[in-house]
A protein has these predicted regions:
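Long, low-complexity, Lys/Arg-enriched
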Residues: 1-87, 101-310, 322, 346-404
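Short glycine-/small-residue-rich Rossmann-like dinucleotide-binding loops
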Residues: 9, 94, 330
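Short glycine-centered, acidic/aromatic-flanked micro-motifs in structured strand/loop junctions
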Residues: 31, 92, 328
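Short N-terminal targeting/anchoring amphipathic segment
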Residues: 86-94
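Conserved catalytic cores of phosphodiester-cleaving nucleases, focusing on short active-site segments
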Residues: 274, 315-317, 324-332, 341
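Charged helix-capping and loop-helix junction motifs
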Residues: 311, 339-340
Length: 404
C-alpha cells in the first residue's frame, strides 16, 4: 500500500490501526481534529517510534460541516497520488459524517476503500467485500500514546529470574493465606527495613520482636516469617526469644522492596495470571502516565513539573484491539475508585477499553457500588474469584471471552 487516507476520528484506534496492519508508505489524516495539530503530530511521531513504522504522516484539514470541502480535500489527495503513480486507499472506519459521505462518493472510480470489521479482526475492501484478516498485538503504551498520554514510568519491569519468579508466586499464595494478618505484618517489616537513603536498602536486618514508635505498636509474626524463609524470600532467619530480637537477610533487593509493599501482591497475582493467558499480548503493572504529549517546546521533564493530570494504573493489559485498565484494591472499592477508573477508560480507550476493579474483599451483587460499576461498564473481581482460583476465568470473561 502506497498511500492511506484516514478520516480523523475521536476514537484513536480508528486513526492508527490500519497503519499498523498495512504499513503504508504515506498516511494522510483528513478532517478536523479536536486538539492542537502540534499535539497530533507529536503523538503520531511517538506512535510510529513505538511500533517501528517508517510511514510518512501528514494532516490535511477540512471543515467538519462542509461536504464540498471534505470532498475537495479527499479528491485532491487522490489526484495527486495518482499523478505520481501511487495507489490510494481510503479507510472509512472512522471520521465525521460528512467526511464519510465524501469518501464514500469515490467508490467505483478505481479508488480502494476499506472498513474495519472489529468483531472479526479484519478489514473489508468495498464494495466487493474482500477480507484481510489481521492479528493485532498493540502494546499498552501504544494505546495510551494514541489517546494523547505519555507513559513515564512502569514501576515494575518484571525482569525476574526463574528463581525469583518461583519465590514471588509462593509469597503471593502466602499473601492470600494470611490475608487478615498481612497488613500488620507488612507495617512491622516497613519499620525494621527503612532505607538508609532513597537508593539503598540493607538486606541484613537485626531488629526487636516488638516495639513502639510514635504511639504505634509493631510486632513480628513468627508464622509468616517462617513461611517466607521456606519460600526463599528471606534467609538465615534467627529468632532469639530470650533477647526479644530477630535477624535475617532478604534474598535480594527486589524481594526486599516487594515485601515492604502491601498492595503489590494483588497486582502481581493479576500480572502472572494474565501473563500466562495467551489472549493478552502485553501485560504491565504500576503504569504511570500523564494526560499530555511532550513536544520540542514542552519536553516530558517540564510536563511532569506542571499540574498536568496524571494517573497510576495498577495493571494495564492489551487484548487485541482493547486496552484493559485494572485497579487493584486490598479494601472494598469506593465510588471515587469507580470515577477515577471510568475517566481513564473513557480517555484512553472509549468504547474499545475495558475497566476492572480487583479487590480482596467481598462485593455484594445487590450493593450500590456493584450496581454503579455495572452502569459505568466496569467489571468487578472480588475475593470469591481468588478463593476459588477463578481469576483467569474472570479476566477472560470481563475482557471479551465467552462464558464456559
Amino acid at each position: 500500500m502506497k498511500t492511506l487516507i484516514e478520516l480523523y476520528d475521536r476514537n484513536p484506534i480508528y486513526n492508527y490501526l490500519a497503519s499498523l496492519v498495512f504499513k503504508p508508505e504515506r498516511v494522510v489524516f483528513v478532517g478536523a481534529v479536536d486538539e492542537p495539530i502540534e499535539k497530533c503530530r507529536a503523538k503520531t511521531k511517538k506512535f510510529a517510534q513505538l511500533n517501528g513504522l517508517e510511514s510518512k504522516f501528514e494532516f490535511a484539514y477540512s471543515k467538519p460541516n462542509d461536504f464540498a470541502d471534505n470532498h475537495k480535500t479527499v479528491k485532491s489527495i487522490i489526484e495527486k497520488e495518482k499523478s505520481k503513480g501511487r495507489s490510494c486507499v481510503i479507510d472509512v472506519t472512522g471520521g465525521r459524517d460528512l467526511a464519510l459521505v465524501a469518501a464514500g462518493s469515490f467508490i467505483g472510480d478505481g479508488t480502494d476503500i476499506i472498513y474495519l470489521d472489529k468483531a472479526n479482526s479484519r478489514y473489508l475492501w468495498l464494495p466487493e467485500g474482500k477480507a484481510v484478516e489481521f492479528d493485532a498485538k498493540i502494546s499498552c503504551e501504544t494505546f495510551i500514546t494514541i489517546a494523547g498520554g505519555t507513559v513515564f514510568e512502569v514501576a515494575r519491569s518484571h525482569s525476574y529470574s526463574e528463581e525469583e519468579e518461583k519465590i514471588i508466586k509462593r509469597v503471593i499464595d502466602l499473601f492470600f493465606e494470611y490475608r487478615d494478618e498481612w497488613t500488620r505484618f507488612v507495617k512491622y517489616l516497613q519499620q525494621i527495613s527503612k532505607k538508609d537513603d532513597e537508593r539503598y536498602r540493607s538486606l541484613y536486618i537485626d531488629a526487636p520482636l516488638s516495639f513502639s514508635d510514635n504511639g504505634r505498636n509493631f510486632e513480628y509474626n513468627e508464622k509468616i516469617m517462617r513461611e517466607l524463609e521456606k519460600a526463599g524470600a528471606i534467609r538465615n532467619l534467627n529468632i532469639i526469644k530470650n533477647k526479644k530480637s530477630l535477624n535475617f537477610s532478604y534474598m535480594n533487593g527486589k524481594l526486599a522492596n516487594l515485601l515492604v509493599n502491601e498492595g503489590v501482591w494483588l497486582e502481581l497475582k493479576v500480572y502472572f495470571t494474565a501473563k500466562d493467558m495467551p489472549c493478552f499480548s502485553d501485560v504491565n503493572t504500576g503504569v504511570k502516565f500523564v494526560w499530555d504529549i511532550p513536544d520540542e517546546k514542552k519536553p516530558l521533564s517540564r510536563l511532569l513539573s506542571e499540574s498536568v493530570p496524571r494517573n497510576e494504573v495498577d495493571a494495564v493489559l492489551s487484548r487485541g484491539l482493547y486496552p484493559v485498565f485494572i485497579s487493584c484494591k486490598t479494601r472494598a472499592p469506593f465510588n471515587e475508585d469507580l470515577n477515577e477508573l471510568y475517566a481513564i477508560k473513557e480517555k484512553f480507550g472509549g468504547d474499545f477499553a475495558k475497566a476492572i476493579i480487583a479487590t480482596t474483599k467481598p462485593v455484594d451483587r445487590n450493593s450500590p457500588i456493584y450496581e454503579r460499576a455495572q452502569a459505568l461498564g466496569i467489571g468487578i473481581i472480588d475475593e470469591k474469584a481468588f478463593e476459588n482460583n477463578r481469576l483467569a476465568e474472570k479476566l477472560d470473561i470481563l475482557t471479551g471471552g465467552k462464558r464456559k
